[in-house]
Every structure is written in C-alpha cells, then in structure tokens.
Amino acid sequence: MREFKRTDRVADQLQQELAVLIQREIKDPRLGMVTVSSVKVSRDLGYADIYITLLGENDAARIDENLKVLRHARGFLRSQIANRIKLRHVPELRFHYDESVVRGQRLSSLIDEAVADDRRRHEDDDEDEVR
C-alpha cells in the first residue's frame, strides 16, 4: 500500500478548496464554468500548479480570458485558502489550462473513426465473399 506524501495531501485539499472558492466567491462575469482538474504542489510547498478546464469552451481567447481572471484573483484565493487550511505557508498559485481533456476527446474521436472504418471495411469484405 502506497503512503501519501504531504504534497499529495496538500494538493488534494487545495483542489477541493479552490473548486469551491472559484465557483462561489469569484463574481467576475467573464469567468466561465471552471473545473479544477488537478493540482500539483512543489516539494517545498512554495508553488501550486493548478490545472483547469472550461465546460464547453475550446476557444483560445475565452481560455486566456478565464486564466487572466483567475490570475488576477490569485491573491484573494491565497488569502481565503490561508483562512481555510492550516499551513505555515500557502503556496503561490499558478494557473494553467489542462489540455489533457481536449487531447483525450480528440483521441477518443480518432479511435471511434478508426473502429467505424474497420467495420465498414469488414462489411464490404463480407459482401464481396457473398457474391
């Protein structure tokens, strides 16, 4: 059984708190439906890289706008986290767009296309054998 490192526990707690704070406390109308997909904390707990996704948004301009809003609010978010989590030092927050979801969707669609092509070829081969 693997023991969780402190950085993993802090990352999980940050992810939960940030998800709530972003949804409930940031009132900027430019902010879309943001999901905190993962958080990675440096070994010294100095930095936290927060990876976000946007529901239904693939436009680069909208993604950049949402990242700007979050980066502008990072001081507020850090202060709120300091009130909610007992840490000697709250990590510096760095926001990034998580492209893994988009890549996963793209790969899934490519696999679906390949399977459909394979089925069509298989059906064509079966028809040729019947003739």
UniProtKB/Swiss-Prot annotation:
> So which residues are the signal peptide here?
none
Question: One biological-process term from Gene Ontology?
Answer: maturation of SSU-rRNA
The record, for Pfam families, names: RBFA (PF02033)
Cell compartment(s), UniProt = Cytoplasm
Q: What is its main location?
A: cytoplasm
General function of this protein:
One of several proteins that assist in the late maturation steps of the functional core of the 30S ribosomal subunit. Associates with free 30S ribosomal subunits (but not with 30S subunits that are part of 70S ribosomes or polysomes). Required for efficient processing of 16S rRNA. May interact with the 5'-terminal helix region of 16S rRNA.
Recorded protein name is: Ribosome-binding factor A
Source organism: Chromohalobacter salexigens (strain ATCC BAA-138 / DSM 3043 / CIP 106854 / NCIMB 13768 / 1H11)
